[in-house]
Amino acid sequence: MVERVEALADRKPNEDRPVPAITVPDITVLPRIPEPDPTVARMRAVRSLTTAPSGLEGEGFPVRRAFAGVDLGDLDPFVHLDQMGEVDYAPGEPKGTPWHPHRGFETVTYMIDGTFEHSDSNGGGGVITNGDTQWMTAGAGILHIEKPPEWLVVSGGLFHGFQLWVNLPAAQKWTPPRYQDLRATEVALASSPDGGALVRIIAGEVSGHKGPGSTYTPMTLVHATLSPGARLSLPWRADYNALVYAMAGHGTVGSEARPIQTGQLAVFGPGNTITVAAQQAQESRSPNLDILILGGRPIGEPVAWMGPFVMNTREEIMQAMADYQAGRLGTIPAIAAVHNAPTTIVETGQPRDGEPAH
């Protein structure tokens, strides 16, 4: 059912044309998400709206730091979100990240366009492309590497995706590492009542439609595309927080119809319904409003965050550093270069400059 809007082979490096999203041949055949019952719906208002700064990650690929400037208390159970790339690389340009450690959380890498390879010290890994998701539970500790395949480095091509960090409760931070390979064809698809919005449910549940991702932390992750003038209202669990990130386009969010545009994050207040609408006029490069909608049950525990480690206390962070330096987080091939461990600990707050590689 899932198809590309245009073939990768037809793209020329560095052309200023839209980066296509995953779509379907006929949205009218998809199940519809019903309009919320007005007698019970409580529309969430927008608590804050921030604009993501741009930076470089890993070996130099561009990112937008979607959560920058937002208090971790509003993000809980999430820690970090990067919009990666949205570029059409020339030959030799694609970049990745070298081998590096993680402990205490999960990384969720969602590829919209392009191809990324993953390998880890637990034997997990694979290649994700065009709507695929890799869900890596670092848990007690793991080493991994993420990079474009060699053929993409040689030829150049599209690269656009997201990486989300999902915190783990203290009781599950020591769970064994695992890897989930979620293909685009497994993602639950639905539409708005009028067919103007395509909803892809990667994890969690929306109106009975369940995504394939298996999560330790109760949460929902959705990628939605709204055509110009379309409106989408989603039922949203009242015990979850709610965030909307605009990856492309212009629209409004929340009960007060607050304007939102590319690179902005809306944090919602309490309620059980999220409302988003696309402006009728969109830019040629972004003909639709593309958004990530995410939320989960707050963990409500202290957070100590240093680079690639997310724990509950400073002592646990120091132990993670020691375990990494001693080789207790796994082994990698001798030819691979390992980054230096970072040196700044952030406790229950937003990370400082010099954030970790993914």
How does the language model describe each region?
Residues 1-358:
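Jelly-roll (double-stranded beta-helix
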